[in-house]
Amino acid sequence: MRLLILTCLVAVALARPKLPLRYPERLQNPSESSEPIPLESREEYMNGMNRQRNILREKQTDEIKDTRNESTQNCVVAEPEKMESSISSSSEEMSLSKCAEQFCRLNEYNQLQLQAAHAQEQIRRMNENSHVQVPFQQLNQLAAYPYAVWYYPQIMQYVPFPPFSDISNPTAHENYEKNNVMLQW
């Protein structure tokens, strides 16, 4: 039993993380690393992100408007060219006009599909941005290595019972002298 306890203690001691040697100034000055980040820097970061988002949104709406204008101009240009050409048979004229109309409708449909996809992408981006955390996170000596939290928890929880029982004293009833029962170890 003692050998088992000894081996467990040795295993825990060997598995214990080494102290961080890269940043000795953090170990010497733990109060500096746990200082709260000023609110102004967070607001500046969020304002910068909002400005970038607005600029991107404006660029994308301009691109959509440009493509919409180009598609309508293509349809308008295609119709006069069709009229100017002299085609002898009326069946060819009707087939060309139907093709031009179908092309314009298909182009408008594609533009609507692009707008819908763009709107869905914007909604997805806004949802992602609402879940983005501020990149300024506090660093302290325990956060330098993530496995150190297992050994050094920051909040000690109240434990209502002792984690280890006293092995040296056996557990017995008050009147154990009168009973012929073996003691529990």
Curated annotation (Swiss-Prot):
Signal peptide range in chain numbering: 1-15
Protein role: Important role in the capacity of milk to transport calcium phosphate.
Cell location: Secreted
Tissue: Mammary gland specific. Secreted in milk.
Protein name: Alpha-S1-casein
Assembly and binders: Heteromultimers of alpha-s1 casein and kappa-casein; disulfide-linked.
Residue numbers of Phosphoserine PTMs: 31, 33, 41, 71, 85-86, 88-91
UniProt keyword list: Disulfide bond, Milk protein, Phosphoprotein, Secreted, Signal
Primary site of residence: secreted
Family assignment from sequence similarity: Belongs to the alpha-casein family.
Transmembrane parts of this sequence: none
Species the sequence originates in: Homo sapiens (Human)
A Gene Ontology term for the protein's cellular component: extracellular space
Post-translational modification: Not glycosylated.
Extra remark beyond the main annotation: In milk, the alpha s1- and beta-caseins precipitate in presence of calcium (so-called calcium-sensitive caseins). Kappa-casein prevents the precipitation of the other caseins by calcium through the formation of large stable colloidal particles termed micelles.
Source taxon at top rank: Eukaryota
PROSITE patterns: CASEIN_ALPHA_BETA (PS00306)
